[in-house]
Amino acid sequence: IKLSDHTVVSTDMLVEGVHFDMTFTPLKHLGYKSVIVNLSDIYAMNAEPKQITVSLAISSKYTLEAIDELYDGVLLACEKYNVDIIGGDITSCLNGLTISITSIGNCKKKDLVYRSGAKENDLLIVTGDLGGAYMGLNVLQREKEVWKSNPNMQPDLDNFNYILERQLKPEARKDIITFFKESVLKPTSMIDISDGLASEIFHICKKSKVGCQLYEDKIPIDSQTYQTSMDFNINPTVSALNGGEDYELLFTLNQKDYEKIKGNPNMTIIGHITKKEAGINLISNGDVSTPLKAQGWNHFEI
């Protein structure tokens, strides 16, 4: 790390029974995902992750082979994102599995992006599509209940490949940070979508002391996510707003930079920033404005 750079650090902990269910989570996928959720936080500051530490608390129900499988996923993510493991710890616990990863990155001070820089009239932009991870989780939980009532029943996972991958093996948006650098583009604020779009919009608006207009018909939702939401009698917009675990990037951009992102298939303009007094509002498909509500992840509810 160059002396002129700033160091960016993020830590995330994943606890069995709270953040993941071993009934349907392959250990290799879990190892991979545990790295991704940390790297995503670093990218959300427009920084580049360089190193991680990995700490585990493991109960006796896990074999050495199981631990190896978990680490295979960790190593796969590190290899893909060019990150080094520089340390960690491992200890026993009475039950379950807990994974704690700390990621360390760097960025020039002038390039750092926080949640607090959004200004009135900035564009509100999101990468990728939303709600897929949440609907993938719904499918897995449904099949778990079927299996519990009839262990001989094979899970019905056909036609759900995309949303299952969004849940079990997400990716971090390194490509977007590369695009920013190549385009000499700097968002005014940014956050990754771990707790749901609505929740992250509130974070940016609160830190930036601004309001927002979010347009329902602009929210990007994949066709598989949409159809699965309908099958579960869940409004697809609710899946996107409150589902979480998408690990896409939500950012604001000065309107003068619009031409640099125009036509980019990886980004969707979903609204704009307003004065704080105007509030945080969702403009529905019927062109009706209602205050946006955030019902994302609550760390103290299980």
What do these predicted ranges mean?
Residues 1-302:
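Helix-biased detector of long, well-ordered alpha-helical tracts
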